[in-house]
């Protein structure tokens, strides 16, 4: 069975790629990572940074998660991410996504031993 940490990696990590400006990136990746099986996952974020850098967020700024739990952490540096959003009018099984690249601080929930990311909570604008 897939562990929460492995699920996080499958759904959110894409270290090898910089998500070129490829407009079909989300359509390909959402399918490849099994997020269009049985339904179209409405929103998903991929992080284009080394896994070690994302795991290190668990040692960074501790904040409260959207659901009120206290095990969320915000990255101290901005990260290169791609947001995938289901386009309006898109219906399963033809899941179509809008691809947008961003530089954001990301917020992840961590748990376990080793203490690793298990949930992508949010991304926040880099304050200038």
Swiss-Prot record:
SMART domains: RNAse_Pc. It catalyses: an [RNA] containing cytidine + H2O = an [RNA]-3'-cytidine-3'-phosphate + a 5'-hydroxy-ribonucleotide-3'-[RNA]; an [RNA] containing uridine + H2O = an [RNA]-3'-uridine-3'-phosphate + a 5'-hydroxy-ribonucleotide-3'-[RNA]. Keywords: Disulfide bond, Endonuclease, Glycoprotein, Hydrolase, Lyase, Nuclease, Secreted. One of its GO terms (biological process) is defense response to Gram-positive bacterium. Its EC number is 4.6.1.18. Substrate binds at residues 7, 10, 41-45, 66, 85. Its main location: secreted. CDD domains: RNase_A_canonical. Residues 1-13 have a biased composition (Basic and acidic residues). SUPFAM superfamilies: RNase A-like. The keyword Transport does not apply. The keyword Kinase does not apply. Residues 14-26 have a biased composition (Polar residues). It is found in: Secreted. Pancreas. Pfam families: RnaseA (PF00074). One of its GO terms (cellular component) is extracellular region. The active site is at 12 (proton acceptor), 119 (proton donor). Monomer. Interacts with and forms tight 1:1 complexes with RNH1. Dimerization of two such complexes may occur. Interaction with RNH1 inhibits this protein. Endonuclease that catalyzes the cleavage of RNA on the 3' side of pyrimidine nucleotides. Acts on single-stranded and double-stranded RNA. Belongs to the pancreatic ribonuclease family. This is Ribonuclease pancreatic.
